[in-house]
Amino acid sequence: KPAPEPAPEPAPEAAPEA
């Protein structure tokens, strides 16, 4: 079983929330 992917980093505040 491959190693689990790293946790997703927090999106920057500039990220558009669609």
UniProtKB/Swiss-Prot annotation:
Keyword hit for Secreted: yes
Q: Please provide the record's keywords in A-Z order.
A: Secreted
GO cellular component annotations, sorted alphabetically?
A: extracellular region
Q: In which tissues is it expressed?
A: Expressed by the venom gland.
Major location (coarse): secreted
Locations listed in the record? Secreted
Protein name in the entry: Peptide 2699
Source taxonomy lineage? Eukaryota, Metazoa, Ecdysozoa, Arthropoda, Chelicerata
